[in-house]
Amino acid sequence: MTWYEGFLTKILHILIIIKFANFTPHTIVLNGGVELPSVGVARVANTFSAFDANGVCDVHFGDIQGLPEPQEDTLFVVSALVLSAAKAAGRTDCVAPATGHPECVRKDGFIVSVPGFVR
């Protein structure tokens, strides 16, 4: 068994034991073909300053919206921005698609599938 097959076996094992709840606006497709449809959308609230003379403004991030309270045996799939905010808030039950991983599959510049998740 190659390391990749071993990794996929571990992912499939986790999928059986742990429930993944996708709170991104898109269906997440794993390289092995497993699809996780969106069940909601978690976002980070934001406010913007006025634009300066160069057309640049500041963004200020606030609380996470649309993310349920922690649930036993559940990992919430969220965007990288939401994951960062969740980690800052002490949440350990969130992951994001591994879109920057070298095994991420792209076609015509768009992500087709990811090999797994990042914590």
How would you describe each model-predicted region?
Residues 3, 7-19, 23-27, 31-119:
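Intrinsically disordered, low-complexity segments enriched in small/polar residues
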